[in-house]
Curated annotation (Swiss-Prot):
Record-linked CDD domains: RNAP_D
Naturally occurring in which organism (per UniProt): Pyrococcus horikoshii (strain ATCC 700860 / DSM 12428 / JCM 9974 / NBRC 100139 / OT-3)
Listed EC numbers: 2.7.7.6
KW Transferase (keyword) present: yes
Protein name: DNA-directed RNA polymerase subunit Rpo3
One Gene Ontology molecular-function label: protein dimerization activity
Coiled coil: none
Amino acid sequence: MVKIKILKKTEDSITFILEGVSVAFANALRRTILGEVPTFAVDEVEFYENDSALFDEIIAHRLAMIPLKTPTDRFELDALELDDYTVTLSLEAEGPGIVYSGDLKSDDPDVKPVTPDIPIVKLAKGQRLVFNAYAKLGRGKDHAKWQPGFTYYKYFTRVHISKKINGWEKLAKLAKKRGLPTKENEEEVIVETIKPFYIPKEFEEYEGKEIWEEIVPDTYVFVVETNGELPVEEIVKIALRILMRKADRFINELQRLAG
């Protein structure tokens, strides 16, 4: 049975244990989060004036990398075919001063820069910058600007520490200081590595013998971080629904071919 246990959740990241799946599924989830979950990003820019020190292409690239809020209630983000919808972000600025992401005017109030203080370009006195930037939905597999964030996973393991070691108490205290769950019996201390646990150099001679690591089958520690376009929990939910839709499409195609 597949189980998910949330270990830690903040505004921009989530850490959870995923249990009961193969490494192939864990990697598929990771790849789907990075490459398939869609977000809005600037894809085309039309310049009318640019007296700044930067070429049009450089400004366009900077605009493309600004994270844009992506409303989950208006778009079917788990669909295999994306909605063809364009948002216009316009700007008319004159120096002296710095142009920030918050200066962009969106024709859709739900799609706007995540943070207003990302610098775009510095204008000297008399310099002007006028453009329309067009944002659309896209996927990270086509360009990194559409990635909703970052994710990685590791095998969930247990480190067994024998009490025959002189100074085993130090390792137990170190694990607790790191916030790692520990269990103890008469013979050993067991540390659950929900995050990395590094053995001090003075204990290296015991590794593989009195200190050994057990890999828990089909169990992984996932960390997902968001750029701000989507709530972090929505990124995981959308990725799982996309995987389900792809599996359903594959099964339907097999059934069709089987006649």
